[in-house]
Amino acid sequence: MNIAELPLLTVPLELKAHEMARQLAAVQSTVQKGKRVYLNALAVYAVHRYLKWLQIETDLEGSDSFNQVKTALANVADLVITGIGSLECRPVLPGETTILLPEEVIENRIGYVGVQFSDRLDSVQLLGFAPTLDSSNPPQQIAVAELMPIDTLIEQITRLEEALAFLETDDPVAVQVRSEIETQSRSNIVAQFERIYRTCEDYEWRYAGGEMLAGSTAGGEFTRESADSADTDLEDLAEALLEKLAGIWREAA
C-alpha cells in the first residue's frame, strides 16, 4: 500500500527537543551547517520519541547526530537503537519528494525514516521507512513515494533482534559465522543478510551472501586456488545462515 493512502503519524516537538538541537547548531562553523544540524537533530529526536512510546530502547546521546564533533564533520542524522544498530532519520522539507542520502549514511544503517517538516517546527510527521540498502551499489536518494509504512520499521527491528539472538547461540552455523566476522559489526552483517533474504530469490542466497561475507572478511594473501576454496566455504556458510534465519523469520511471521 502506498503511504499516501495511510494517515501519517504526527510527533510533537517539545521545548526540550529544540533546546538540544540549538546547542548542537550553535557550535557549527556556518549558518547553513547550523540549520542542517538543527533539523537533523529534531528529526532524530522525533523518531526517538516514537520508539520510546513503543518501549524500544534508544541511545540518543550515543548517536553521532548528537555529537558536536561528528556533526561538524558529517551530515548525519542517525539514532542508535540499543543492541540493534543505527537508524538514519532524514528530514524532508515542504515540497520535497525525495530523500537525499549523503555518502556517509549509506553504510552501517539498518534503515531510513523520512521525517516531514512543515513551516512550523512544533511537530513533524513520520513519512515511512526504507530498510537497509545494498552498500555495494547504493542509490543517491530515496523517493518519498517508495517509503514503506512506518510500522514496517518495527518488523525490521524484530527481525534483526531475532537474527542477533541466533548468532549468540551454540548452533554450529552461528559459531562459524561469529568466527568469520570476529572484527565486524554483527548488526551490520545481520542487516545485510536481512536485505538479501528480502530482495533475493532463494537460489541467489548462496552467491549474494557469500559475496557479502567475502567483503566482510577480506584480508591476507591468497593463491587463486585458496581464494576459490575460501569463496566456496563462505558461500556454504552464507547459504546455511540464510536458511536458519529464514526458518526463524517465517515461523515468527
Describe each PLM feature range.
Residues 1-83, 90-253:
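Nucleic-acid endonuclease domains
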